[in-house]
UniProtKB/Swiss-Prot annotation:
The gene is DOCK6. One of its GO terms (biological process) is small GTPase-mediated signal transduction. Keywords: Cytoplasm, Guanine-nucleotide releasing factor, Methylation, Phosphoprotein. Residues 1587-2023 form the DOCKER domain. It comes from Homo sapiens (Human). Widely expressed. Expressed at low level in spleen, cerebellum, hippocampus and in substantia nigra. Transmembrane segments: none annotated. The modification Omega-N-methylarginine is found at R865. GO terms for molecular function: guanyl-nucleotide exchange factor activity. This is Dedicator of cytokinesis protein 6. InterPro entries: C2_Dock-C, C2_DOCK-type_domain, C2_domain_sf, DOCK, DOCK_C/D_N, DOCK_C_lobe_A, DOCK_C_lobe_C, DOCKER_dom. Coiled coil: none annotated. GO terms for cellular component: cytosol; perinuclear region of cytoplasm.
Amino acid sequence: MAASERRAFAHKINRTVAAEVRKQVSRERSGSPHSSRRCSSSLGVPLTEVVEPLDFEDVLLSRPPDAEPGPLRDLVEFPADDLELLLQPRECRTTEPGIPKDEKLDAQVRAAVEMYIEDWVIVHRRYQYLSAAYSPVTTDTQRERQKGLPRQVFEQDASGDERSGPEDSNDSRRGSGSPEDTPRSSGASSIFDLRNLAADSLLPSLLERAAPEDVDRRNETLRRQHRPPALLTLYPAPDEDEAVERCSRPEPPREHFGQRILVKCLSLKFEIEIEPIFGILALYDVREKKKISENFYFDLNSDSMKGLLRAHGTHPAISTLARSAIFSVTYPSPDIFLVIKLEKVLQQGDISECCEPYMVLKEVDTAKNKEKLEKLRLAAEQFCTRLGRYRMPFAWTAVHLANIVSSAGQLDRDSDSEGERRPAWTDRRRRGPQDRASSGDDACSFSGFRPATLTVTNFFKQEAERLSDEDLFKFLADMRRPSSLLRRLRPVTAQLKIDISPAPENPHFCLSPELLHIKPYPDPRGRPTKEILEFPAREVYAPHTSYRNLLYVYPHSLNFSSRQGSVRNLAVRVQYMTGEDPSQALPVIFGKSSCSEFTREAFTPVVYHNKSPEFYEEFKLHLPACVTENHHLLFTFYHVSCQPRPGTALETPVGFTWIPLLQHGRLRTGPFCLPVSVDQPPPSYSVLTPDVALPGMRWVDGHKGVFSVELTAVSSVHPQDPYLDKFFTLVHVLEEGAFPFRLKDTVLSEGNVEQELRASLAALRLASPEPLVAFSHHVLDKLVRLVIRPPIISGQIVNLGRGAFEAMAHVVSLVHRSLEAAQDARGHCPQLAAYVHYAFRLPGTEPSLPDGAPPVTVQAATLARGSGRPASLYLARSKSISSSNPDLAVAPGSVDDEVSRILASKLLHEELALQWVVSSSAVREAILQHAWFFFQLMVKSMALHLLLGQRLDTPRKLRFPGRFLDDITALVGSVGLEVITRVHKDVELAEHLNASLAFFLSDLLSLVDRGFVFSLVRAHYKQVATRLQSSPNPAALLTLRMEFTRILCSHEHYVTLNLPCCPLSPPASPSPSVSSTTSQSSTFSSQAPDPKVTSMFELSGPFRQQHFLAGLLLTELALALEPEAEGAFLLHKKAISAVHSLLCGHDTDPRYAEATVKARVAELYLPLLSIARDTLPRLHDFAEGPGQRSRLASMLDSDTEGEGDIAGTINPSVAMAIAGGPLAPGSRASISQGPPTASRAGCALSAESSRTLLACVLWVLKNTEPALLQRWATDLTLPQLGRLLDLLYLCLAAFEYKGKKAFERINSLTFKKSLDMKARLEEAILGTIGARQEMVRRSRERSPFGNPENVRWRKSVTHWKQTSDRVDKTKDEMEHEALVEGNLATEASLVVLDTLEIIVQTVMLSEARESVLGAVLKVVLYSLGSAQSALFLQHGLATQRALVSKFPELLFEEDTELCADLCLRLLRHCGSRISTIRTHASASLYLLMRQNFEIGHNFARVKMQVTMSLSSLVGTTQNFSEEHLRRSLKTILTYAEEDMGLRDSTFAEQVQDLMFNLHMILTDTVKMKEHQEDPEMLIDLMYRIARGYQGSPDLRLTWLQNMAGKHAELGNHAEAAQCMVHAAALVAEYLALLEDHRHLPVGCVSFQNISSNVLEESAISDDILSPDEEGFCSGKHFTELGLVGLLEQAAGYFTMGGLYEAVNEVYKNLIPILEAHRDYKKLAAVHGKLQEAFTKIMHQSSGWERVFGTYFRVGFYGAHFGDLDEQEFVYKEPSITKLAEISHRLEEFYTERFGDDVVEIIKDSNPVDKSKLDSQKAYIQITYVEPYFDTYELKDRVTYFDRNYGLRTFLFCTPFTPDGRAHGELPEQHKRKTLLSTDHAFPYIKTRIRVCHREETVLTPVEVAIEDMQKKTRELAFATEQDPPDAKMLQMVLQGSVGPTVNQGPLEVAQVFLAEIPEDPKLFRHHNKLRLCFKDFCKKCEDALRKNKALIGPDQKEYHRELERNYCRLREALQPLLTQRLPQLMAPTPPGLRNSLNRASFRKADL
């Protein structure tokens, strides 16, 4: 769509005077839409500058809340309970706290324990949940609120539901007779039919004569009923992408878990059962080569087997009987295996020997091997009795977890496809409630697979030399290979059944890794499930939240190969010792399975006869809370005697070693390689390491390391990082004051501890990320304490504030970096956010809920302000200050009694602000990266300060000291400057900083002086404004400022912050009645506007001052919508979305539910009306075409009147609207389109943005007090009021209901992001938002469209986008969307109607009311013409009746088109399927007639318009129901009969005559409905109806336009053009009779060159021009401008049809009119179009480039066709239509109409003998015909166009033989030529024309031969003379001419017809003519051969010689035939014979 068509309503604005207009606006506030809004007229403050806000607190003091009535009181001030302190108990997963009990804890452990049990301290803003940040309006919440909406009834939906209504019950197969031959039903029967119909119900009050005021009141009351309270609940939710203010409260810190898998061990069975077997489960990651879980020990032995160990066992603890385990996997991978190891009781023999029975003996052979089994059982019993406490490795296997979780049962796990040496398992899937489909995309996800039961059947025996984890990883890697080495091993056969499933959310009977009971734990006696601790494959960054202190000991290997003696069966015992006495072993080692919970010692499995065993054992220990220097692990090595020998002990100690657990205060972990002592360690050994060579001790292998062991701690107490350890140690030393203290090699004293602490603070940045994140809460707490509680050393305060602050910045940065992947959209780290929200508390305070205790006096003191502090912050303080505390004027080293008070007075927020302001550049950079954290910390500190000190009652101005506020000012200025300077370098950081600053200021609004915060906002705005002037890319800055404003406005008390209750608004007055309107001041009268009201509706200085935040937001919107705004498209969306989001929030906020409150809230947005009104030219045009809307504003604009108004704004679409049909896209041009709007209006808004803005406008109109709107309307100028009406018009178009079918068709794609939006948004982003460039470019590369320019108008592309990107919705969802859309359309229209009523009341008695009311009526008419619900139409028609009743002159004395338009609308609704609509439409139409009659005792105008409307309506509306229209006619008749007021007049009689007349017209024209699917018949009917109105030019013109529209719809542009030419001729004929102007056509004759058919328009009757008759030829088409419009449309259609020559003829008639009007612009355009037309003619001279049409003769035969029987037509079909195509189309159409097996196509072209046809069938004969021209015509028809235009005669030929065959031998082959003449020349106003004359000529065989030879000769001549020559074509023609042919070649023709001289003298002439033809043929062959010889190459010489030989043979054969002479040839021929010869051959020669 061209810009000029899109913005028709703005055409009247004159660009040349734009500067003057701007000046005038700044002086006079005239409100031109294109004047700059940058100057606010009230105080002269430009919009680009921020006004000084009011002092908020002072304003509130001067206006206490009690001053407001009732509910408005809550809008004045924040609620008293706005801020509260919550102590939320920390969530504990276990039933026991799990913290150390009654132990003397050191400072570090105590601090950790306290942290893990203390409550969360939460500062709660009680109403924050109501803000847009925390309670967003989303699609889901909207849907919830939309429940219970009433269903609106729409005509288009009703018509779809009632297809089987009476109107469709007629027999669709009845004859399609021609209407012109069908007699009209008699008047008597028509009257009878109408009288017998039932009328609809009558409106009881219609015939009452009520006062207008009463009618208005009644209408308003009815309109107010059952309205939805929240308009925007019906509108789609705000765009989530724009919601920069979106926040969510962080999740409380919780223990980290990965994806959890539940493994249940069900049973373990071997072929033989002789001894107990014990199992171990663990997870291993092969890729990472890491064990990723602790061990789970299970015991599935039977009681009898367990009984064998009774001698060694104690009563097993319930926790060791677990058979289920929950494993956690943080990093799922396809390389994870569940490894199952089996152990057995130690026995004599190596592992292979012990496994042999299990591999050899089978259960089926039990009887055969009974003795062996008994022997084995006996041996096993002995070993269990003696060696029961020792274990030995037995077997192992592994399950590949990825196969389990990814397969859906496809794997056949019963089959051992990879051989017997591979572990086999079967998989049985349980299909139950937990059955979940596996994700095919993510095969490694362990969270959503189907539970599986595995049966593991094969185990591998353990190999003594390959027990280490390294060997295990090799085995596991090998298992995945097809050629596994394990296949060659013999398996240990067993059956282990295990269940693997996703772990449930809250499993019952679950134990933590510390064996604590996890909630819920219903019964302590139930068999537990164990949570297995994960050892993540990679780092996991999560803070510790609970106490955990576990130590894992992994003995790896022992090398006793050099040890002398019998040391072979080695076992390692481990003990946790608190001292050196054997009794000091602590019971902290976790038991395995079926044993006690904790033990004092544990042993490794024994490898038989191995002096250098490897171990896979894992010992798990519970570390004591306090680990001291004496705590150590003692390892004792035993030789175990497997065979009982007399005098030999069971176990012999053969070595000792140990590991001290604490060294320099740090827990020792990691790998160790320890020497082993042969002797027992000496006293005091525990404080030393074994590496120290103690005197007198013997060591294995000369004190070398022979025992490899590894310690791993999982502790939330011990950081295990040197830098963190040192930091915590130093802090706790300072807290305890325990000097001196040894730290590694350094002895800390009071003198050097400060230096060490500073170094430790600086070194924190070197800490490992994982422990730093884990202990981040501890670290941050300590740093906060150091900032605000500086330690005292030797009586001196150590100023560590800066160092601690810098350390805090680095720690936060490290934590951020580590958790980068987990950050939210705003770059916040969830863990840090959770720390601030939950964990942070002010050190030294015990938070409790304030309960009236006296406030603690706290002085505001800050640390020293360094030299980096800006000079502006000193505020002229001259007092000398202490280096550590600025409030102390004392020497730094002095000790004062007030030190304790000072220490208690440091406030974190003050220190943070100060340190930030004075920080160095490096630190500041780190802080800026994560400014949000420090801002939130500061805010929480301030809130705690107020809450704990009970300062909330303190006036806000006194809550915080001035110095702190100065620091805040400097800080905000500094951060704001960073935002501005970084926006072009690091956009992402700038965005995050901008948002952080906005949220900080928003938070401050709840805590400090709000006027102070507003001043900060203003300062920031000024900073941005300053930079904007020099910015290379202002759009980026404007975007950030927009987001900044949006965040500020998301505050939960946004409305209160805008001071809504202060007296800027005028006092409300009651809505005036008609009688009281005179007392009001009105712009239409001489009084001046009310400045108070004006300032409320404009972005005036007072408005922006008082409503500061609303002013900022609306100012941003106004600036973004300015035509010259930078980055407009992106800013439009952002600004409009911000307003929309706020209004949605108001609609859903329960605080504003009452109408009075919401009205006060709406006042904050009143300038939105002016903004939208002025933005009108750039809003998306939702109307189908310009229509009425383009003329509302201009009609009221006084500047457009006068001579410049040549445009008269005639628009053909107006007439088409009356006719009920749309024009073709190219036909909307008006004579006065003016300059293209886009160049003037700037960047147009997208459809989505425009619609959202209009929804916001409607919200304001709906919720504002009507009296206030009325006073505003009173002050508007006429142009402003016109633009307001334009806006309302656009609202109606934007929210028009699309119908259920539209939702089904596009699956609810109502204003979602189209490709157009996406492309433009990307463009905007690429220009402004640098951080997103890569993403956008990538998405663009993937786009199938490449360059997205001009995508806006690529409808096909947009359609593709809609259908391909949509998410398919269910029928219920589409039903719901249609329901909501219907309610939205209804409510939007009702709001518009309410506003129109207000405007009508405003201008009722003004001087300019006619022009305003005319525009109002146009909007009302548009609303009635669009798709509306029955509910709205009731109210809309009531308003229309009231309007026409009060101002009848609008319709009957002013604009004719208004009356025509109204009649059309009412008549359409009279035909509605919905009875209520018909009732109201009938009432309106009746009242219209009555009012017209009361004015002049005649209603000729209404009669004429209703008649015209009915004709148009029935002719063009498809879903029109004539039955319902008849009922409405009956209803009107009933009104006339019951109206007593006009009983004595002729009114009732006239109404009756009109109704009967309409009824008859309806009956006549209703046939058109039957032929909607038959385009030819439909056009014929329209043509005949138009011809029937030959005496009524208005109606004929209407029908011609209808036909043009239909033709355009069908793509028949030539025919559409002819319709417009006929219409223009009709108008010209009328104008020529009315007045004589030289520049006008003289009538139809002037158009004869365009079409000879046009002369039929001259039949115009004189009485039409009678001035006495009202309403005839009164349409605007019957003017010069109307004629111009019709001619332009004709030219447009001709151009589209490729008939460029006709375009010239049209413009020949148009140019003189334009010259007479001196419309040079239009003339330039016309000549440009002529140039284009002529250029195209030149380039398409051959004619092949444009094919004009194909013609067919179609004959209809049979009674089924009715009046078409035996009729012949010539059909014009699209170019290159084949005979088969039209045959198929017609056959298919009539088959559908008449039924199967009825229609037959006659295949030949022979004359049809009807007597031979089946009377029950319908026959169609179709023949291809060609245009025929006489010889004299060909002289004039030179060009291809000439031979395809103005065609009346057509020819077709039919071959036949005397015996009836089509083809036969040459002597009997005849040909019939048929000439057809049509009534009119093609192209005509229809595509089929009746044949009016037929002439046939029969050719004899010789004449046929003559024609054939002439044709061959012409072909030869053409091929020979072709330039450039075409050798191939020439040879082809030659070959066909001289080559030997099978039959009917030239030689055979000659032999047949020339061999003998005919006996009949009549044939002599034909004989001679054929002879001459052959002579000419031979000559042409010779010429062709000569030409061919010149063209060929050497390779074709032989071929040419062959052609010459053939030619010679042909010539020789022809020679005797051609030399015969006819003796009587020259004899005189009788006259009669001469004539017959002429007749027979005259027209055939050149065919």
